[in-house]
Amino acid sequence: MDAATLTYDTLRFAEFEDFPETSEPVWILGRKYSIFTEKDEILSDVASRLWFTYRKNFPAIGGTGPTSDTGWGCMLRCGQMIFAQALVCRHLGRDWRWTQRKRQPDSYFSVLNAFIDRKDSYYSIHQIAQMGVGEGKSIGQWYGPNTVAQVLKKLAVFDTWSSLAVHIAMDNTVVMEEIRRLCRTSVPCAGATAFPADSDRHCNGFPAGAEVTNRPSPWRPLVLLIPLRLGLTDINEAYVETLKHCFMMPQSLGVIGGKPNSAHYFIGYVGEELIYLDPHTTQPAVEPTDGCFIPDESFHCQHPPCRMSIAELDPSIAVGFFCKTEDDFNDWCQQVKKLSLLGGALPMFELVELQPSHLACPDVLNLSLDSSDVERLERFFDSEDEDFEILSL
């Protein structure tokens, strides 16, 4: 199995193509580039995103479960990538760049440690898979974009260093009042006893010397995830321009989705092609050294990223945004409102101030969903299910 996987992955690396020579701008997570004058900057931006792929020979999930996620963990890895981008923006900033063999700040290794393949890392494959069991997903079962978003939201409660407000907008509706209420609420640590002792905290998200308190903050940084279905079996062309504009926003975290049972993390576009990081490469698991230093080169894509036609995108996706401040959120709202002015384009979701009366009013401070709720949402959004709503065809 390993030999076949390695052979397949070697072929995949040989197939990567350079960017096309085009006057079309390249958009990467809110940044605009020119192929002709900024190619090195494009590749540096791509290489600075955390790239999570299949891994093998990690500690068994649940003690007796799988030691590799090859063949089933691609959407989980994409969920890790979009969430890692939120943590990078939170702790390092969007303009931070990774350089091979250059010393990085401690906060970088703290972010990376939160995703290492072991049971005590906040967003590890172990935590995601085991949290998914509580939501009706057996270990080794494929996730849709909504399911992984729901699981990551629950895991974020334990990450008091990042102190994120995670909101998943359901029913294709983003309610501004709900988000403001959530982000202005201080949430105490819910998982202080769920992770190792203080001496191990640096390996799980807390940098050495970090101060973690429950002091109220005027605005907790927002991770906004919006699961969507943009067509029946293919993406509706009327959504394409709106989708492109999502990658232009400075708050963009990208998109998770891809093709049925083959997930990708989309970070931008050029012309009519999406740019993405592909998790379908199996690499050996990485263990931090005694000083919590991580050999990190395998977590960065150092070749031109993959591209695919937007028309090939499976219509089941989740779009992500990060708003570090309330001003960022207000700016994002204004940009979304302007999208309605795009000629011939359909909005992918609705932005409203208050909860519409025809929708049940959720408890926005409830940080978990029961399994029946998750099962209902999963049936609605996951691409493998045929019972879904069609948006504005």
UniProtKB/Swiss-Prot annotation:
Annotated phenotype, changing residue 246 to S: Does not affect formation of disulfide bonds
Effect of residue 301 to S: Does not affect S-nitrosylation. Does not affect formation of disulfide bonds
Reaction it catalyzes: [protein]-C-terminal L-amino acid-glycyl-phosphatidylethanolamide + H2O = [protein]-C-terminal L-amino acid-glycine + a 1,2-diacyl-sn-glycero-3-phosphoethanolamine; [protein]-C-terminal L-amino acid-glycyl-phosphatidylserine + H2O = [protein]-C-terminal L-amino acid-glycine + a 1,2-diacyl-sn-glycero-3-phospho-L-serine
Record flagged with keyword Mitochondrion: yes
PTM annotation (N-acetylmethionine): residues: 1
BP-aspect Gene Ontology terms: aggrephagy; autophagosome assembly; autophagy; macroautophagy; microautophagy; mitophagy; otolith mineralization completed early in development; piecemeal microautophagy of the nucleus
In-chain residues carrying the UniProt-annotated modification Phosphoserine: 34, 316, 383, 392
Cystine connections: 292-361
Activation and inhibition: Inhibited by N-ethylmaleimide. Redox-regulated during autophagy since reducing conditions activate ATG4A whereas an oxidizing environment such as the presence of H(2)O(2) inhibits its activity. The cysteine protease activity compounds is inhibited by styrylquinoline compounds 4-28 and LV-320.
Domain of life: Eukaryota
Keyword annotations of the record: Acetylation, Autophagy, Cytoplasm, Cytoplasmic vesicle, Disulfide bond, Endoplasmic reticulum, Glycoprotein, Hydrolase, Isopeptide bond, Mitochondrion, Phosphoprotein, Protease, Protein transport, S-nitrosylation, Thiol protease, Transport, Ubl conjugation, Ubl conjugation pathway
Enzyme Commission (EC) number: 3.4.22.-
Location of this chain's protein in the cell: Cytoplasm; Cytoplasm, Cytosol; Cytoplasmic vesicle, Autophagosome; Endoplasmic reticulum
Comment text on domains: The LIR motif (LC3-interacting region) is required for the interaction with ATG8 family proteins MAP1LC3A, MAP1LC3B, MAP1LC3C and GABARAPL1. Required for proteolytic activation and delipidation of ATG8 proteins.
Record's subunit section: Interacts with PFKP; promoting phosphorylation of ATG4B at Ser-34. Interacts with GBP7.
Protein family membership: Belongs to the peptidase C54 family.
Name of protein: Cysteine protease ATG4B
Protein source organism: Homo sapiens (Human)
Gene designation per UniProt: ATG4B
